[in-house]
Amino acid sequence: MIGCGACEPEVKMAGGQAAAALPTWKMAARRSLSARGRGVLQAAAGRLLPLLLLSCCWGAGGCTAAGENEETVIIGLRLEDTNDVSFMEGGALRVSERTRVKLRVYGQNINNETWSRIAFTEHERRRHTPSERGLGGPAPPEPDSGPQRCGIRTSDIIILPHIILNRRTSGIIEIEIKPLRKMEKSKSYYLCTSLSTPALGAGGSGSASGTVGGKGGAGVAGLPPPPWAETTWIYHDGEDTKMIVGEEKKFLLPFWLQVIFISLLLCLSGMFSGLNLGLMALDPMELRIVQNCGTEKEKNYAKRIEPVRRQGNYLLCSLLLGNVLVNTTLTILLDDIAGSGLVAVVVSTIGIVIFGEIVPQAICSRHGLAVGANTIFLTKFFMMMTFPASYPVSKLLDCVLGQEIGTVYNREKLLEMLRVTDPYNDLVKEELNIIQGALELRTKTVEDVMTPLRDCFMITGEAILDFNTMSEIMESGYTRIPVFEGERSNIVDLLFVKDLAFVDPDDCTPLKTITKFYNHPLHFVFNDTKLDAMLEEFKKGKSHLAIVQRVNNEGEGDPFYEVLGIVTLEDVIEEIIKSEILDETDLYTDNRTKKKVAHRERKQDFSAFKQTDSEMKVKISPQLLLAMHRFLATEVEAFSPSQMSEKILLRLLKHPNVIQELKYDEKNKKAPECYLYQRNKPVDYFVLILQGKVEVEAGKEGMKFEASAFSYYGVMALTASPVPLSLSRTFVVSRTEVLAAGSPGENKSPPRPCGLNHSDSLSRSDRIDAMTPTLGSSNNQLSSSFLQVYIPDYSVRALSDLQFVKISRQQYQNALMASRMDKTPQSSDSENTKIELTLTELHDGLPDETANLLNEQNCVSHNKANHSLHSEGAI
């Protein structure tokens, strides 16, 4: 600097020695301070000293303008441009190797040669240790009270020989950072400045021209000679003097190639993770099931997966090893791109967890069969690639853990699985009940399903098989009935209803006779017998009914067998199907809850057919009365329930004159009394043959055939429509009308044998031809109004003794009226009274003229005792 005596006389030096006076003054100030304020002065000296010098020079007026001979003062460095590899961190510059960095130099008289006064060293500035300081005393002085020389100037940082000036107070220099040595991750360098401008003029090329602290060109007292040519370099006394050079960030691969590899590895990671869950979740048992009963696509998938899945441990080791290798490589590549900080952790976690774990496992958990089958070639490839490592480990696992069997369900688990999956499977409720019942068969005993003894229908062994007993058996609806003697628990025999097929109730056969003849074996079982064992016994065909007993050892005395109830095959089947089997004879829906069955129809009451001797003149059995009643109600439309109630029909059949007998006379086969119907003779009654044979002659051709029991005739006599029979109509019938009326297309239905429905008339023309001569001679007796007359065109003659039903039109009409009254809602007393009055009119009513005419022509006289045909007059 130029001389400045007013401010600092000791600092006046020539040429390059002015810069060296600054540290000397600072060191003198340090020695004059107390130990307590030493640190503060030390921190402020380096920054405030240049400013004090400048203010001193300007204030005293002794400082000259800056010129070419003015010394350069360097205050500090700052990083000009910051980026990913060059930045400020904690007051130090952090740069990367193999880079060029621009630094801004701050100071006074910055010129084009300032770059040559800056250097860096690898050695850190020496600091006093606590042991070198006195406890409570002042710090030991610096060596010879001079500045510290820099160590060897490093060659790793090269100062490029140019500077960009800015107002002589700052400039921009550029440095080049060379590569670090091997095994070095980072390295610290420290700023040094020279006391003179190197290689500049006579006074600056070799050494300092003045002395500092009484020493000559040897440099700072107490230090070895300067190592760099003849220039003295000292540590820069400031805070921003440290530069940290870090390792250059290198990518393992080019960036674009790394992105491709990362994407591929993410896909492989997801595949391994998904296959690990999807394939290992498919146990061998499930794959076999799918192979046998899945869809065609599922069968194909299972067939491709099953050989690989059979080697479970080998597959598991291959998938896990591949997954670990892929994830490790992926982590390294992501770390190389994102770095090793928090960003790298977040990126790696998101990439692996979301795209490598969550997404593929969510897909494979639902579509593992399809994904595993479509990627089976990749699975086999990686199993081959990892064979050296995964196969030995898998064999070790096989030896330690044993063979993999798969998921096996016992009865309880299978039943619970069906219940839990009920909303999602296609089983209907009945199918599910049957499956549950079959699975629970071995867990239940016969005592759980048996019918208790008190609720069983049983018959005493002393019973007589008359109509009352057999009716009771039929009404019970059971096919196998236990027979007891004395107490109900003493079951000695078994009666099958089919055993009564050849039993006549009129014979009053003792029950013991039937049971001893058939001698059905009794089957006893204990109350703890399982239902599956009971079903096997029933399947052997020994019996479909078993008697349940238990050993009673309660109380005093010897143990004995106690009968609890009976169990049937139907009970076991009902337990399997979880539903009650009801037929038309069941009384209860369940033999335990005793819930009544709601029958849609009235139950048949066989007691109505139990007749007394005084009710009928002709003795018939209750069975025949029942058969006759059912035949008329079902086969003859005129007596169907829609026309006449069954109760009224039964009362009609029980009237004394409805059922009649006719004794056949062998000597006089064609006597008038042997004819039930004669051709062209009007009648008003219906006939049903019960026993015997008749000969029917029908048509103009006189065709003859025989008929027997349950053939009937004269239905139209009961329901014949009114026919106009006026005298004028009778005598004006022409031959043409007769022929026209007798055309083959009109209602011709000759009588049929074998109990089939017989026609009432062959043709309307035949009836007209027959009516003309008969009614023409009786025109004085008949009115010109309508007459309900039925004229058969056939003859019915007895061929043997007959027993038949004969119902007149009047009786039928009264019965119809009684049926209508029976259906009309009214009090029961008035109803029964009116019905009885109506039925009484069947024989109390006065016959009209037509009835008298019919009676005269068809009444049969009693020629022999006990061989007569009852008069067909109104009942």
UniProtKB/Swiss-Prot annotation:
One of its GO terms (molecular function) is ATP binding. Residues 121-149, 741-763 are annotated as: Disordered. Residues 1-250, 360-368 are extracellular. Residues 272-313, 335-338, 390-875 are cytoplasmic. Induction: By low Mg(2+) concentration. Shares weak sequence similarity with the cyclin family, hence its name. However, it has no cyclin-like function in vivo. Glycans are attached at N112. Divalent metal cation transporter. Mediates transport of divalent metal cations in an order of Mg(2+) > Co(2+) > Mn(2+) > Sr(2+) > Ba(2+) > Cu(2+) > Fe(2+). Residues 450-511, 518-584 form the CBS domain. Isoform 1 and isoform 2 may interact with each other. Widely expressed, with highest levels in kidney, lung, spleen and testis. In the kidney, predominantly expressed in the distal convoluted tubule and, at lower levels, in the connecting tubule (at protein level). The lineage of its organism: Eukaryota, Metazoa, Chordata, Craniata, Vertebrata. It holds the Pfam family Ig_CNNM4_N. The N-terminus is cleaved within the endoplasmic reticulum. The signal peptidase complex seems to be involved in the processing, but the exact cleavage site has not been identified. This is Metal transporter CNNM2. GO terms for cellular component: basolateral plasma membrane; glutamatergic synapse; plasma membrane; synapse. GO terms for biological process: magnesium ion homeostasis; magnesium ion transport. Disulfide bonds: none annotated. It is found in: Cell membrane. Its main location: membrane. Residues 251-431 form the CNNM transmembrane domain. Residues 314-334 dip into the membrane without crossing it.
